[in-house]
């Protein structure tokens, strides 16, 4: 009877910076390289593998073997540990749509570096106009007293973001359509702080309009109520502090004043740094 050793059910959560690094490594690959591989860094907690960083592993794939610069990978991992000790090896990544014949050989190396490494593939060829992301774990297969092998089994994978990453992604989305519309600027600068407040307020008003429309449709029996949405709205109402309009206006104006003070101080520091740089350059030129 054959035996199958299944690892824990895992969910892989990938941060956008990891995907950007993989695409960047693919764009910088050697002309004779068909695909690029590398190490995934992150953490594992309660069946969730969170991938927060990665780096490229130089390698060459031949018909019957794989050559990889393992010393380079070890040195780079040690350097990363000095910066962020919480990021450990959780698996490896490769560009392409599918698992290749060499994947099992590469996976054996990472199985020695961590427990149950995950394998992430990113379709950089944009098949179907999408950059497909897949994740796998290696399942051990074998017959008692006989040969053993492994099989890559797909697992759940999703993209997650921290709040600063969401801001960066929203800024990147503003560059969509630049090539198709030559009149649009090719670069996008971050908005000023007050402009961000205005933009966030407009989005909040739009969301409130959707919520009000949903509540009115439920009250007029045009739409069936959902308990999950109702509980979420109730929690939202309870989270709002009980204050009058004047109290809210006073609190808001106080926060705006603090924001303006921070912006003013930031501009002063920026001006001083620019002045110091010019004075330093002038002094060096005179000497």
From Swiss-Prot:
One cellular component term (GO) for this entry is: eukaryotic 43S preinitiation complex
What's an example GO BP annotation here? translational initiation
UniProt subcellular location = Cytoplasm
Domain of life here?
Eukaryota
> Is Cell division given among the entry's keywords?
no
Q: Which residues cross the membrane?
A: none
Q: Which UniProt keywords apply?
A: Cytoplasm, Initiation factor, Protein biosynthesis
Give the MPN domain ranges: 12-142
- GO molecular function terms listed in the Swiss-Prot or TrEMBL record: metallopeptidase activity; translation initiation factor activity; translation initiation factor binding
The principal location of this protein is: cytoplasm
UniProt record similarity statement: Belongs to the eIF-3 subunit F family.
> What role does it play?
Component of the eukaryotic translation initiation factor 3 (eIF-3) complex, which is involved in protein synthesis of a specialized repertoire of mRNAs and, together with other initiation factors, stimulates binding of mRNA and methionyl-tRNAi to the 40S ribosome. The eIF-3 complex specifically targets and initiates translation of a subset of mRNAs involved in cell proliferation.
Describe, as the record does, how this protein assembles with itself and its partners: Component of the eukaryotic translation initiation factor 3 (eIF-3) complex.
Its name, as the record gives it, is: Eukaryotic translation initiation factor 3 subunit F
Native source organism of the sequence: Anopheles gambiae
- Kindly list the organism's lineage: Eukaryota, Metazoa, Ecdysozoa, Arthropoda, Hexapoda
């Amino acid at each position: 009877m054959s035996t199958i050793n299944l690892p824990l059910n895992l969910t892989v959560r990938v941060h956008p910076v990891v995907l950007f690094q993989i695409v960047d490594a693919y764009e910088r690959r050697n002309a004779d390289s068909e695909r690029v591989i590398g190490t995934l860094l992150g953490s594992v907690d309660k069946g969730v593998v969170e991938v927060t960083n990665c780096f490229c592993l130089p390698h060459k794939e031949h018909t019957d073997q794989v050559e990889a610069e393992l010393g380079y990978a070890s040195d780079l991992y040690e350097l990363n540990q000095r910066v962020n000790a919480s990021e450990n090896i959780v698996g490896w990544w490769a560009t392409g749509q599918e698992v290749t014949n060499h994947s099992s050989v590469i996976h054996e190396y990472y199985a020695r570096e961590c427990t149950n490494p995950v394998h992430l593939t990113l379709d950089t060829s944009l098949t179907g106009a999408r950059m497909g992301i897949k994740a796998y774990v290696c399942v051990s297969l074998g017959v008692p007293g006989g040969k053993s092998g492994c099989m890559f089994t797909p697992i759940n994978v999703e993209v997650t973001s921290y709040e600063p990453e969401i801001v960066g992604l929203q800024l990147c989305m503003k560059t969509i359509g630049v090539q198709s519309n030559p009149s649009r600027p090719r670069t996008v600068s971050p908005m000023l702080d007050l402009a961000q407040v205005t933009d966030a307020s407009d989005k909040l008003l739009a969301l409130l309009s959707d919520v009000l429309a949903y509540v009115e449709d439920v009250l007029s029996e045009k739409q069936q109520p959902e308990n999950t949405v109702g509980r979420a709205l109730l929690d939202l109402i309870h989270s709002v502090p009980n204050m009058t309009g004047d109290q809210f206006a006073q609190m808001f104006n106080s926060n705006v004043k603090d924001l303006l003070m921070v912006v003013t101080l930031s501009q002063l520091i920026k001006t001083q740094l620019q002045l110091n740089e010019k004075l330093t350059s002038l002094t060096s030129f005179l000497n």
